[in-house]
Structure formats: structure tokens, C-alpha cells
Amino acid sequence: MDIITATLLILAIIPAVSYAWGMRGTTIGGEKGAMLPGAMIGLLIAFFSKILIVQEHFYIFAALGAVSMYLGGSMTYGETLGLSMNQKPAENMKKGLIALFIKGFLWFGLFGAIFTTGINAVCYTYSIIELLIIFALTPGIAVAGYFIFNKPLNVKENKFPKIYFSKTRQESWGALLGALLVLIVFAIIKLNVLTIVFSLSCALFGGIGWVLGQLFQIYSIHYAHNSKSSFCRRFSNKNGVDSWKIMECVLGAFGGLGAAVGFLLTYDNFKLTLFNLEKNDGLLPYNKILALVLFIIWVILLVGDMVHYFIKRPITKKELKKQLKRKQITQEQYAVKRLKAVTAVPRGYEIYDSFTEKIEPVLYCAIPFILICIGSKETALISSFFLLFLVVAQEIGLEKSITKKFNLPFKIVLGVVTLAIFIIQVVFSFDFSVIGTMLLYTFGYELITMVWLGVKTVRLFRKDIKKSTEEHTKKELFKLFINKNKPIITVHAYFTICMILSVLFVI
């Protein structure tokens, strides 16, 4: 790759993935939220590859990126972050930072391994027998890693794993380690330089990025406000800076850079891998009928998964207290809802919730990945666009609420758009183009998020003003609003800059 294109890739991917990781934490979170930065990496790698067959079939790489980043989101890290930042001096700074390096290493390393394994699969570098071996071994070794490294855990009985980076939460990084080992060992056996080098680059930058991001967060919380430099004091969370978001965006920036460096180091290997993709002019299923049948079954399962969003589980008093503490509800709302709240969730709901939670990695990661690997074009198409829209529509339209007045219309609009995207992509095999897909990943996500967040922010501000006995002019109210919501405003101003850059780079 020429130096100009390589430079452009790096300049594009840093702000793009920095934004995407920050948006993950803002809107969706968890495994589904991680699909956005993964898809962003895949999209930009395809676009800047300057290889016609890859650019024409960019959706394959965006889809692989989305499902490859998913599994890392299963790791718990809130209490891990707390080890180094919840107090001054830190409870255990060394352990906290080492833990973040390990978790960042595994998250991005596994992303790189799955992503490049998928590329090898769609390019027929891995045979169907080899893929079956990978699909068979990975879950088993992952489960073994989970039980070896993350069990036993019983807080009440004071039983903890030998290597433990939290206080009370169940960790799962051992499962990711097991899965990563399977893919890397297989790549070593196959002398697959693409997977080995790309994964290592992603892993190192992911680990380092999380440590540096956390150091920025610690500085923002505990040290920036005492700095002699006025510039440094601006980064204090006491001055309205969202220190958590700084950590997320730094991690995203480094993770994106690691993927870019890994791709540049393996560019020649990547080109050699593409022979069969060029020969077949895109994805060619091992068996067209089987691929179609499995795709239809997957879609039916996705529709079935939507049912749990419409089953209203009774809320517990403990959950209500959490909502009140996080200011998600007012004191008045808490008093009213507490009358209907239950002490414990009925057993039937618990079983159903547990089932839907456990089935999601299969529906949103394992099945689409396998289908793409066996050549399902339909799966690649909808996993690059429809699936990314679906997960944000689920979170904003069905998990969160706006106001009683706008809730139903907003849900209907999101539902209609979701269905329309699905029909357009499946019936007409429409890929929405690189620029169209990038617009969804950036301004599409931001627009949907701001509908929810903007209405919520204004509503809370109005309630605060009504409680106040002071009289304010419009100018004073505007200043109060800005000061009260400075973290939100600064974060989304940063997002906007990153989004504009991301779109401009792919025009």
C-alpha cells in the first residue's frame, strides 16, 4: 500500500473508532454496542484497501467486523476500573491497570482473530472441514477457559477465582482467552500470517489503549482540578468533562489504530488471500440451498427474540431504587411506582430473562458469523446495515422511553424504518454503499440517540426550573442549561467532529 493511502487510513480510523466506541457507551453498551466500532473498522479497511473486489463487497468486511467485536462486550469491567479510580489513593492501581491491559488485549485480540478467520473463510483459505473443526473446538475451549480462570465465585462464602479483577461480579475473560487461543493456534498451524500479526497488533493496542484511557480518566477525576495549568484544569470532571467518556474514546482511538497498523503490516498477505474472492466475484456459498435455509431460520429466530421486548416484567423495589439513584426517575415517580413494585421477580420471568440473555450471543454473533463464513451474501448484507440499525432501534425504541406523548409514534417510526431496511436489503440485495453505511454508523446513530437523550435532558431541566423559586431571563436559562449539561454537550460536540471527519474520508 502506498504511503498516502496508509496515512489516510490511519487518519480516518482513529477518529472513527474513537467516536464509535464512545457512542457504544452512550447508547447501547454491552455486546451489541460493540458491533458499531467493529463494523467501522471493517468498513474503513475495505474502503482504504484500494482493491476493487474488496471495495465492491465492503459489506462483507463491515459485517465481519461487527460480529467479531461482539464477544468482548461480555466482559465485566466496571469494578475493574474502580480498582484504580474510585478513591485517592487508588485501592489497587497496579492490579487495576494490569487487568485493563489484559481485558483490552483479549477484546481486541479476539476481534482481530475472528475478523481475519472470517476473511480466510470467505476467501476459501480455510476449507469447510477446517471451519467445522474451528466451530467445534472454539465453544468447548472457551467454556474450559471460563471454568479454569473465572470459577469458583461465591461472594457470600468468600470464594473467588485465583486471578480475579473485580469485587463481586462474575468475570468471563477466561472464555475469551480460550477462544483466542483456538484461533491463534490454528493460524500458526496454517502459517496464517494475516491472523497472527493482525490479531497481535489489535491486542497490543487494545490493551495499551485501555490503560492510557483509564489514566486519563484518573487524572480527570482526581488531579486535573488542582493543576497549575489552566489548560489541564479544563479536563477536570469538576469542570463538566465526562471523564468516563474520555476513557472510552481513547480506548477506541487506540483500538482503531491497532487495526490499521495490523492491516498495513499484513497488506500483502491480505491481497494474496483474496484470490478466490476475486475468482468468484464475491461470496459463493458452499451450498446455496443450505445457506438460504439457514438464513431464513436465523431471521425467524431474530423475530422471535424481539418478543421479549414486549413482555412487561414486573419491576423490583431494588431496581426502582437504582433508577432513582441514577436520576432516571423523579422522587414522585418513584413513590408511585413503588406501590406496584415487587420484592423479587417471579421465577418464570427470571428463567425467560436468563434464556434471552444467553441466546443473544448466538443470534447476533455466532450464527451470522458462521453463515458469512459459508458464503451467505444475504447475511453479510443485513449484518453490515440492518443489524446495526436493529440493535440501536431496540435499545432506544424498546429499552428506553422518551415521553408518553412521543413514545408510541417514535417506536412506530423506528419499526417501519427497520422493516423497510430489511426488505430493501433482502429483496433487492441492496448494500447502501460505503457512504450510506458510514452515514448510518455516524449521523444515523447520533440522530436516534439525540432524539432520546435530547428530550430526556430538556425534560429534566424543565423539572429543575419548576422546582426553583428564582426567576430567570431566557439568557440566564440558556446559560444554566449549558452549565448543567456541559458533559453531554462536550461529548456530542466531539462526536460531531469525529463523524464529519469519518464521512469526509470516505467521500
Question: Would you name each region that the model predicts?
Answer:
Residues D2-I507:
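Alpha-helical transmembrane segments of secretory-pathway, organelle, and plasma-membrane proteins
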